[in-house]
């Protein structure tokens, strides 16, 4: 077990995002043996779109097993997330949306997490979709609205935004039938 821990620790310390994602996934799937690496995964760098799938599942599956300090650290990181506009001002609604994404993983674990989740969904007026979905879908058409919520687009890094736009498939059905 020590060899696995040491190897995963080196993956966390490496330069490649893919290896860091694999390390987070391993901690999630082998939590009992690797829980001593949780602190390594609880850093602001990983509360980002590129790590969303793996970290969200780690939080969702094991937050209740974290120490009080680890739980507080997660909340502190989430509360510190901000989305800024081009003019460098904080976009309150996009920031709230980004926070709800992470809070959705832990919202059912305590009154505090439920309260924070409700606070931010009140601001966004929407609950985030499950992180396993790479795009957002709806069966409701809203006149003159983008098929991808602006709050979601504002939370994306440049690379994620380009990927989201490039992966969008126009069905040719027009706005009425678009997601």
Positions of predicted regions on the chain:
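Non-catalytic all-alpha helical scaffold/repeat segments
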Residues: 1-179
């Amino acid at each position: 077990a020590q060899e696995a821990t040491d190897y995963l620790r080196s993956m966390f310390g490496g330069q490649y995002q893919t290896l860091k994602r694999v390390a987070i996934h391993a901690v999630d799937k082998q939590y009992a043996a690797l829980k001593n690496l949780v602190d390594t995964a609880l850093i602001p760098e990983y509360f980002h779109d590129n790590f969303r799938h793996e970290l969200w599942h780690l939080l969702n599956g094991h937050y209740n097993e974290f120490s009080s300090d680890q739980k507080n650290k997660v909340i502190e990181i989430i509360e510190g997330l901000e989305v800024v506009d081009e003019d460098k001002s904080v976009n309150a609604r996009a920031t709230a949306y980004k926070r709800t994404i992470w809070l959705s993983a832990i919202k059912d674990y305590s009154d505090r997490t439920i309260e924070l989740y409700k606070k931010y969904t009140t601001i966004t007026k929407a609950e985030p979709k499950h992180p396993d979905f790479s795009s957002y879908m709806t069966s409701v058409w809203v006149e003159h609205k983008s098929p991808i919520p602006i709050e979601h687009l504002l939370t994306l890094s440049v690379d994620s935004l380009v990927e989201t736009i490039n992966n969008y498939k126009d069905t040719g059905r027009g706005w009425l039938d678009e997601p």
